[in-house]
Amino acid sequence: MTDFTIHTIPGSPFARAVMVALEEKALAWRLAPLAPGSLKQQPHLSRHPFGRMPVVEHGDFTLYETQAILRYIDRLAPKPPLTPADPRAAARMDQLMNISDWYLFQGVGNVIAFQRVVGPRVFGVIPDEAVIAACLPKARTVFDEIARLLGDQAFLAGDAFSLADAMVAPQMDFMAQTPEWTALTAAHPNLVAWLARTNARPSLAATTWDLVAELAKKAA
């Protein structure tokens, strides 16, 4: 099968979700690293008119939007399946993928993880404690709900790793690097155990920010 090319800034949790899915399927991929500040410029705008990431190229097929990419990968290479066969479990997977996009990232990860992890590492940002404090109520709601939906299951949509885990784990992995993680997960040992379980998978271990940054250096 033709290799996948992933256009992204190293460290993107959205791109990591794609990498995780490809690793789970044992599909070959290569990194086409983007520089910070290049998303709203050509040639990237010719791939993604909204200037976001990641963008995947597979032969002559170009695709953006992480959820669309993940579902394409799962349909293209159905073994092992990353979508539950049970309709309710599949619906729960879809629900959690959207929670990840609209609530875990928007207003939580893109604030706390940026202020604590990404901003200092990439841009030399000094964390703004007031900005972080303002988003903590939403963060608590998001963590409470994801932990509730996880319950005592091994993974987010049941007993098997799914696209929901591929999406949520990279976001949570950033959050786990912040001091807010301890308080946000204090009442949710199931969430802590789930992240440890997912991070132990070879697909997550092979796609850490540091490893992808090394790939970017080699690709430059």
Regions found by a protein language model. Give the residues of each.
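GST-like domain detector, emphasizing the conserved glutathione-binding G-site
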Residues: 1-133, 147, 154
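Generic structural signal for individual residues within well-ordered alpha-helical segments
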Residues: 45, 91-94, 167, 192, ...
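Phosphate-coordinating loops and pocket residues in cytosolic domains that bind phosphorylated ligands
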Residues: 46, 200, 209
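Residue-level recognition of oxygen-bearing side chains
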Residues: 68, 88, 190, 203, ...
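Short, hydrophobic secondary-structure boundary micro-motifs
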Residues: 80-85, 107-108, 156-159, 184, ...
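GST-like fold's C-terminal all-alpha helical module
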Residues: 100-200
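Terminal-tail/helix-coil boundary detector
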Residues: 206-220
